[in-house]
């Protein structure tokens, strides 16, 4: 596979060396992140069968140009599918073309194939829809429910901040009002009925619930050759990457259906043995966005996939100022949860700071193949090594200082990478859950435990709705009791450790105090940022004392709390706060003059439009 750009979009081309082509249309928002490994797995399987496959991010999503709050995204998304079709047919030489869409991607694929909008109907031979969104209004209700479920678990300050969101926000992904209105108006059954032309064949893979049967009947009424299959693996597919599994049966169904429809010749059969050569790391793929340039790069010995975001007036041979490595959050691809990493990188580029957002092995596009089970990636030694390798790569380019940053598990990888490599001079850790991951502790066990700080639970005692949720969900109180007990023990143990340190005691490197001591000895500065009720502050309290006193004697560590910052940094206000703090830290610690103006510019920079970049057809 190799990176490509077209019309402001960034994607991947899996070369199958036959005349058969497939365009994979991803879903929107968090669903696109959660199903990224599914999209990649389908592409890899089809390429092994000799089919040329393109997958890409729509305008204003993923690594593509544009801000997700921009107007015109509905038309731009459909237009990007037309651009992809033209590219495969005209430049790659594909003759037989199938569109494959997942959830909202199936809706957009159908709209493009049916010729909705200003573009003439393209020549699409077949279409595959996995769990298709049929009625936009119902889809938006589902998204609202998902976000409301999350919002109900947050503090009053965060809920209040979300009431001021400029547009619909679903787990950090913004859906502007005109896109909401456009989606509300879509009913694929009506589209099928009125379309001047439709693909000749269609495969529907549908969960038990949904409007798939209605779409099936509408297609039959237009004479389309429709095959319907159940999507029994759906409940374990649409989950975050640490809990989801690849729907292997559904993937087999898609691949077999497409391959069976492809003409088989001796030349095609031979091509399947040599399909999709590995990317050699060379990339002429660059996205020029007025005041910055982004380039897909292969990083380090493991050839990690990354995006190097540089100010437009910077040349890689003459780097100046600091560079920042942005680690993955959990198993989300490098664009970040809620696309935070892209916002952060582009805000920094505007004030002269270069960033590298990477996929560690097993996440996004790094690694040999898409992983089925990604739960072992988070908090792994390999992830830490990959962040360290990315820092070494930037230092080898000549950047005088490299800083690593991340949220939650990304913060952990950044912190421990600084222990492993001298290339890192600073760490910005946002909502760091644990300073050290205990041996034998599984991610699944942690996910089943509490999701609040002890202080948060004391505040929740007065909220009858929280009590109701505990009873209805049959939550286990024991983790909360253990946390309260650990905080009580810390009132005694932390002062003892501080006294011992003054008389020469040295904590082990595999302990929280040992990690922070090692970084301080090497003159690595660290900024810790937490939401005011984030569970991670309990780990600070257990090992370093009360928040208001922790690190007060340290010249290398600063700690910030903010009531409007949620754990994953979904909110627009929290996003601006975190970006502002990061810019201040770079200005203060890195002595980088351009970044010194960032404290005042951060909120505006984070939200600026990319109006100068075309997000439609080029």
How should these model regions be labeled?
Residues 92-103, 395-408:
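Alpha/beta-hydrolase fold nucleophile elbow
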Residues 100-110, 131, 405-414:
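Gly/Ala-rich beta-loop-alpha elbow adjacent to hydrolase catalytic centers
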Residues 57-72, 358-375:
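Glycine-rich "HGGG/HGxG" loop immediately N-terminal to the catalytic nucleophile
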Residues 38, 69-91, 373-396:
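Alpha/beta-hydrolase active-site loop
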Residues 1-20, 260-322, 571:
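N-terminal cap/lid segment of alpha/beta-hydrolase-fold proteins
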Residues 15-57, 311-359, 369:
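Short, surface-exposed "cap/lid" segments of acyl-processing enzymes
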Residues 235-288, 563-618:
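Catalytic active-site module of serine/aspartate enzymes centered on a nucleophile-bearing elbow/loop
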Residues 72, 122-222, 226-251, 255, ...:
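The alpha/beta-hydrolase serine catalytic core
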């Amino acid at each position: 596979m190799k990176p490509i750009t077209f019309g402001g979009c960034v994607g991947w081309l899996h070369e199958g060396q036959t005349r058969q082509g497939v365009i994979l249309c991803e879903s929107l928002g968090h669903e696109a992140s959660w199903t990224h490994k599914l999209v990649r797995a389908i592409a890899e399987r089809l390429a092994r069968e000799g089919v040329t496959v393109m997958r890409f991010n729509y305008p204003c999503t993923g690594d593509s140009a544009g801000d997700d709050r921009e107007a015109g995204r509905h038309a731009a998304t459909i237009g990007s599918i037309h651009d992809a079709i033209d590219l495969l047919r005209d430049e790659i030489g594909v003759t037989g073309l199938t569109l494959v869409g997942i959830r909202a991607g199936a809706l957009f694929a159908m709209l493009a194939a049916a010729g909705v909008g200003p573009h003439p109907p393209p020549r699409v031979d077949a279409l595959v829809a996995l769990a298709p969104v049929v009625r936009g209004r119902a889809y938006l209700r589902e998204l609202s429910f998902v976000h409301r479920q999350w919002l109900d678990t947050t503090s009053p300050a965060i809920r209040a901040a979300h009431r001021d969101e400029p547009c619909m926000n679903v787990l950090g992904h913004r859906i502007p009002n005109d896109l909401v209105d456009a989606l509300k108006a879509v009913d694929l059954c009506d589209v099928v009925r009125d379309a001047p032309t439709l693909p000749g064949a269609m495969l529907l893979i549908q969960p038990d619930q949904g409007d798939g049967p209605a779409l099936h009947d509408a297609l039959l009424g237009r004479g389309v050759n429709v095959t319907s299959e159940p999507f029994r693996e759906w409940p374990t597919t649409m989950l975050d990457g640490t809990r989801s599994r690849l729907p292997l049966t559904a993937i087999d169904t898609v691949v077999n259906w497409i391959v069976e429809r492809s003409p088989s010749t001796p030349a095609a059969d031979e091509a399947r043995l040599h399909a999709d050569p590995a990317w050699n790391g060379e990339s002429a793929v660059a996205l020029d966005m007025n005041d910055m340039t982004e380039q897909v790069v292969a990083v380090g010995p493991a050839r990690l996939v990354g995006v190097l975001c540089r100010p437009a007036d910077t040349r890689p041979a003459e780097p100046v100022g600091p560079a920042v490595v942005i680690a993955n959050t959990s198993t989300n691809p490098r664009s970040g949860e809620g696309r935070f990493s892209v916002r952060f990188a582009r805000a920094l580029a505007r004030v002269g700071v270069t960033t590298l957002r990477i996929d560690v092995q097993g996440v996004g596009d790094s690694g040999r193949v898409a992983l089925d089970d990604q739960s072992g990636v988070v908090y792994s030694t390999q992830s830490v090594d990959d962040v360290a390798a990315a820092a070494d790569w930037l230092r080898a380019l000549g950047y005088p200082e490299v800083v690593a940053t991340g949220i939650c598990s990304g913060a952990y990888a950044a912190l421990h990478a600084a222990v492993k490599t001298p290339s890192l001079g600073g760490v910005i850790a946002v909502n760091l859950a644990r300073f050290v991951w205990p041996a034998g502790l599984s991610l699944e066990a942690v996910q089943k435990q509490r999701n609040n700080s002890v202080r948060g639970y004391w505040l929740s005692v007065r909220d009858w709705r929280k009590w109701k949720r505990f009873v209805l969900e049959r939550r286990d109180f024991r983790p909360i009791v253990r946390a309260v007990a650990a905080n009580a023990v810390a009132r005694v143990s932390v002062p003892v450790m501080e006294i011992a340190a003054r008389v020469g005691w040295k904590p082990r490197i595999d302990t929280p105090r040992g990690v922070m001591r090692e970084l301080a000895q090497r003159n690595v500065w660290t900024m810790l940022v937490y939401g005011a009720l984030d569970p991670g502050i309990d780990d600070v309290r257990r090992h370093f004392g009360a928040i208001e006193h922790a690190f007060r004697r340290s010249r290398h560590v600063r700690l910030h709390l903010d009531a409007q910052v949620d754990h994953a940094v979904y909110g627009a206000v929290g996003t601006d706060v975190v970006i502002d703090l990061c810019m201040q830290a770079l200005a203060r610690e890195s002595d980088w003059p351009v970044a010194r103006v960032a404290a005042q510019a951060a909120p505006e920079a984070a939200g600026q439009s990319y109006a100068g970049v075309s997000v439609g057809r080029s």
